[in-house]
Regions:
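An active-site-proximal structural segment forming one wall of the substrate-binding cleft
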Residues: 1
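Beta/alpha (TIM)-barrel catalytic core signal, keyed to glycine-rich beta->alpha loops juxtaposed to Asp/Glu
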Residues: 10-181
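Acidic/hydrophobic-patterned starts of short beta strands in beta-sheet-rich repeat architectures
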Residues: 4-5
Length: 181
């Protein structure tokens, strides 16, 4: 069995009851223990909770939003919806796909082997903007001076974990060195 089965994104053009009935079948068959959502808006999470209740099935137990110092949008409605409905929050990418490690300098070409240096579209279309890189460098300096040498990636992860709505984070290191750091 799977402990947690995630619905990774919303269903355009699909009735909400259909995927929830499929999840209920998996739950009843013992193939999954719990289910959760990733990348859903707060109103949609609330709708899922209510629909699950109408179907007499368990609701989601966990939500996996993209949340970090550079992307605080989940604070607008997702975190509140999760708290209201008793859903655990386990954000992914607390260091913004590496930008909040401080390894990317504004105006500089990213090093080969890095996510941005490899041309990963997810980072290049989202976090890899001059203003985000400048914010990361300012935070890096702050951590080195004011926080007595705390690494920016540790500070950024601790910042996410300091939110009362957050249960844990998904760190997502790309290399063993990043994991041991």
């Amino acid at each position: 069995h799977l402990d947690v089965y995630y619905l990774h994104r919303d269903f355009d053009g699909t009735r909400l009851e259909d995927p929830l009935r499929a999840l209920d079948d998996l739950l009843r068959a013992g193939k999954i223990r719990y289910w959760g959502v990733s990348n859903f808006r707060g109103w949609r999470i609330a709708e899922m909770v209510h629909t699950a209740r109408q179907l007499n099935m368990p609701g989601p137990v966990v939500c996996q939003p993209y949340y970090n110092l550079l992307n605080r949008l989940p604070e607008v409605e997702v975190l509140e919806a999760c708290c209201h409905h008793g859903i655990g929050v386990v954000p992914y990418s607390p260091i913004a796909r590496g930008v909040l490690s401080g390894k990317y300098a504004p105006g500089a070409k990213p090093a080969e082997g890095t996510r941005a240096g490899r041309g990963d579209k997810r980072i290049l279309q989202t976090e890899f903007r001059e203003e985000s890189l400048a914010i990361a460098q300012t935070l890096k300096t702050h951590c080195e001076v004011k926080k007595k040498g705390v690494a920016l990636q540790h500070f950024a992860t601790a910042w996410v974990l300091a939110n009362k709505a957050v249960s844990a984070v998904i760190a997502g290191p790309r290399t063993l060195d990043q994991w041991t750091d």
